From Swiss-Prot:
Belongs to the universal ribosomal protein uS12 family. GO terms for molecular function: rRNA binding; structural constituent of ribosome; tRNA binding. InterPro entries: NA-bd_OB-fold, Ribosomal_uS12, Ribosomal_uS12_bac. Disulfide bonds: none annotated. Residues 103-135 are annotated as: Disordered. GO terms for biological process: translation. GO terms for cellular component: ribosome; small ribosomal subunit. The keyword Cell division does not apply. This is Small ribosomal subunit protein uS12. Part of the 30S ribosomal subunit. Contacts proteins S8 and S17. May interact with IF1 in the 30S initiation complex. The gene is rpsL. It comes from the Bacteria. The lineage of its organism: Bacteria, Bacillati, Cyanobacteriota, Cyanophyceae, Gloeobacterales. Residues 124-135 have a biased composition (Low complexity).
């Protein structure tokens, strides 16, 4: 505990808040180019092949970003938009790729939460479109 004299000599410093997404540099999204698109396995106890991409951003950072949704069209040199948001079971993945922008296609046949996956509203006649084989 400092004395009054010590506080007069040097006031208390304001603690700086550490950002959870430094590569965005206080922007909501950033554009980047995929340098590698691959799958990786999550931490225990989960098991899957999660789709991720290594992205070189316009801010100069190179980060690992998660590709959400079922299926994707990304490959090396694809131009993507990323946002903040980590994936809890993938260590080091602190960003998400935004579906439906730039070179990233939206998720096909998505009916719910479409805005999160870049899917356009289906035409009224196509509502019950191919969901699988009918018997």
């Amino acid at each position: 505990m400092p004395t009054i004299a010590q506080l007069i000599r040097r006031e208390r410093g304001i603690a700086q808040r550490k950002t959870k997404s430094p590569a965005l540099k206080a922007c909501p999204q950033r554009r980047g180019v995929c340098t590698r698109v691959y799958t990786t396995t999550p931490k225990k106890p989960n098991s899957a092949l999660r789709k991720v991409a290594r992205v070189r951003l316009t801010s100069g950072f190179e980060v690992t970003a998660y590709i959400p949704g079922v299926g994707h069209n990304l490959q090396e040199h694809s131009v993507v938009m990323i946002r903040g948001g980590r994936v809890k079971d993938l260590p080091g993945v602190r960003y998400h790729i935004i579906r439906g922008t730039l070179d990233t296609a939206g998720v096909k046949n998505r009916m719910q939460s479409r805005s999160k996956y870049g899917t356009k509203r289906p035409k009224p006649g196509q509502a019950a479109a191919p969901a699988g084989k009918k018997r």
